[in-house]
């Protein structure tokens, strides 16, 4: 059994998500201790619990310590089968963070996995669903992963109620990812949404983002989406199309925050990524690590984050030396697979 210290590095829920996904993939039992030890409210939160329970079902696993507040979890995986996975987080807990745990395991299931998850689609401290659909999945297709994620309904803090569904097929053809530096940006796309709010909120967010992004001198198309759900909320995701991958920026609206500020924030986030010329933005940088370990390849990242370093560490607890990372936290960097996980 592999023992993972959950207080390592940034000590958040990511250690848990990656560890249990890798346990499910490898069939190697894992015990995670000191879960979220560095957080103000340590232990499992509802979205972590839901990720574990979904992986338990997917991997026919035995689990000990799976309850809110638990600081130690043991996961003993069985066989990764396909089928249907239903997850109701029950709060505005992040759907995308649950999917971050599920995706690496789902691609190793024997058959196609269909999923439907209810919770928060656009919430603080997690990737918005539009980023996952348009940036993360775009990158995963490059390495041979087939699947689709669809947004059925938005869910914001505190009520949630968002619904995301989709499917992932078994990963048969594993393509190496070489994504170092881009030369050209072809266009910028985006989605600006307003839920249970006036249409002008989405329009103002989009307009402000477009004003900032004009400096790139490329076509810009930001869709405006107005919808209804359990509670109000707004946000915007923008992404740049290059010859290698897509780089993204995003921002969430909140009460008292002008829509223009939200739009500018997302645009500035994107501009800070693309000025590095790295093919991989700082958000995708950590998300891609478990997949890169298996596909092989070499990437340049706009910024090495603590999340990336932590994910590298977790992968290497299972597989030994896999990566060579150049660059310090907060700097542009490079990640190279020196030995594929398998």
Curated annotation (Swiss-Prot):
It is found in: Cytoplasm. Its main location: cytoplasm. SUPFAM superfamilies: EPT/RTPC-like (SSF55205), RNA 3'-terminal phosphate cyclase, RPTC, insert domain (SSF52913). Optimum temperature is 95 degrees Celsius. Pfam families: RTC, RTC_insert. The keyword Transmembrane helix does not apply. Generally, RNA 3'-terminal phosphate cyclases are ATP dependent, but P.furiosus enzyme preferentially uses GTP rather than ATP. Catalyzes the GTP-dependent conversion of 3'-phosphate to a 2',3'-cyclic phosphodiester at the end of RNA. The biological role of this enzyme is unknown but it is likely to function in some aspects of cellular RNA processing. This is RNA 3'-terminal phosphate cyclase. The lineage of its organism: Archaea, Methanobacteriati, Methanobacteriota, Thermococci, Thermococcales.
